[in-house]
């Protein structure tokens, strides 16, 4: 076999190898950035996250951005998948949550929690047991009303 034929074979094998590596790349390489706004007023009333329900995949990053001052975003300890890293944002700053485990992540704005400022992030498929556990979490009345609406969107 000539040198040119060997070079052509090497190029072809290299291209096939590159395509195989891309096909086998981890899902995190395809992760999305999802923006959630923290607002004083929105479509669902006062003190809201918009959107209040987000469906994400493992590896996605959710960015909670203050559209108005006096908000933060933090995970709810009683509504967080086992092994997931909690997140507690600083007032008036973007809070970033990269989801690493499938399940339901409850989010609250601490200063406005009792006013119903909550959100829900669904990561991957949720088991019936996880959904039942999230529905059983005790929340302040207005937060419970909004969380119930978000939980109804879980599929």
What are these regions (language model features)?
Residues 3-16:
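Bacterial N-terminal signal peptides that target proteins for export
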Residues 7-10, 23, 101:
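Residues at the start of alpha-helices and the adjacent loop-to-helix junctions
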Residues 14-25:
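Bacterial N-terminal signal peptides
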Residues 27-155:
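Extracytoplasmic copper-binding redox domains, predominantly the cupredoxin/blue-copper superfamily
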